[in-house]
Amino acid sequence: MHLIFLLFLAPFCSAAVFQLPTKSTGSLRAKLIRAGKYQEFLITQHAARLNTISQPISDYSDEVYLGNFTVGTPPQPVSLVLDTGSANMWVIDASCDNMFCNGWIGSNYTRQKFDTSKSSSFSRENRKFSIQYGKGLCSGYLGTDTVGLGGGLTIRKQELGIANKLDVDFAVQPMDGIFGLAWPALAVDQITPPMQNLISQLDVPVFSVWLDRKIQASHGGSAGMITYGGIDTKNCDAGVTYVPLTAKTYWQFKMDGFAVGTYSQYGYNQVISDTGSSWISAPYAMINDIATQTHATWDEMNEIYTVKCSTMKTQPDLVFTIGGALFPVKSVEYILDIGLDEGKCALAISPLMASGFGPSWILGDVFIRQYCNIYDIGNARIGFANAHHSF
């Protein structure tokens, strides 16, 4: 463990540090439940998974965080998921006019699709791409173009996917594509991920993510900040606990132990930090122990664990030991009101089937809302700092 205090503010005053706001989609589950469409969504989702093999691990089936980008010359605006669990960038092809590319009408979101014919800087490659995510497939063809991140930050000749086929998970989310922030080894088709093309423009090869507290499930809005080239000293504590990465694919590292209530488990676990996953994913073997400690019950119809909403503030902390330091997650963060009946709330923890050298835990937005995550590319490490919130 390395505990570092950020007393070196001067280097972050240059123009090579860029802070850009993020926005939340709100809870997809809540929207589908409210519309009476969630069971239909689950059936379609299961059918799509039967004959696929996943590579990037992110799960976009609930709340996700987006950044505003532009692609092309002149620039065309798109809202992309900021995803540390995958490494590719893709946008939706304007020529794709089916229901999945156009998006679910109930999302109240008009898709911003990319029209390659209107970009003078677009160059099409003679290559197709196909990416199977944790829950959802997208495919199309590859090309290069200019990508704007905001604040004058631009990547020229970024290789990206132009998607003309999407699965249901992407169809129902109010988003226009993915901006992958993982390592090159995870990239499909051996493309260079955006962050690797961005590094030369930054003070230091670092980016940090701060997500604001969860908002009412039915609303989206401004909900965080991503800082390229430095650490968000306004929204994050000065004390940062760093741990080395165990693999430069995902942002993967070792966790020393986990505890909730009277249950504890110690010993190394492979964990990843994933801004593209809404919840925390835990090993199957531990899910029952977590459910026991929180008095959660399995909701067969909605395929989630639930607890009484009245216990949202009184449940035990989820305590993660990382780099010798304790990182408790309060129950107000991992118990979510998504509009279920009978005063029930969702336990924002899902099972993960681990194998080989991959992760056995995923720390998604539930964890990141409580702790700023600092992604240090240059030193192949990840850091965690207490997040500041106004309420």
UniProtKB/Swiss-Prot annotation:
| Induction remarks | Induced in response to thermal stress in conditions where severe cold temperatures are followed by warmer temperatures. In particular, induced in the warming phase (10 to 22 degrees Celsius) during the cold (4 degrees Celsius) to warm (22 degrees Celsius) temperature transition.
- Which EC numbers does the record give? 3.4.23.-
Q: Which pairs of Cys residues are joined through disulfide bonds in the record? A: 309-345
Gene3D superfamilies in alphabetical order: Acid Proteases
Q: What are the residue boundaries of the Peptidase A1 domain, all occurrences included?
A: 65-385
Q: Its domain of life?
A: Eukaryota
UniProtKB keywords: Aspartyl protease, Disulfide bond, Glycoprotein, Hydrolase, Protease, Secreted, Signal
Q: Which residues form the signal peptide?
A: 1-15
Q: Which residues does the record list as glycosylated?
A: 68, 108
Signal as UniProt keyword: yes
Task: Give the main EC class.
Answer: hydrolase
Active site: residue positions: 83, 274
Q: In which tissues is it expressed?
A: Expressed in intestinal cells.
> Mind telling me which GO cellular component terms the entry cites?
extracellular region; lysosome
In the record, the note on similarity to other proteins reads: Belongs to the peptidase A1 family.
Q: Under which name does UniProt file this protein? A: Aspartic protease 17
Q: Which organism is it from?
A: Caenorhabditis elegans
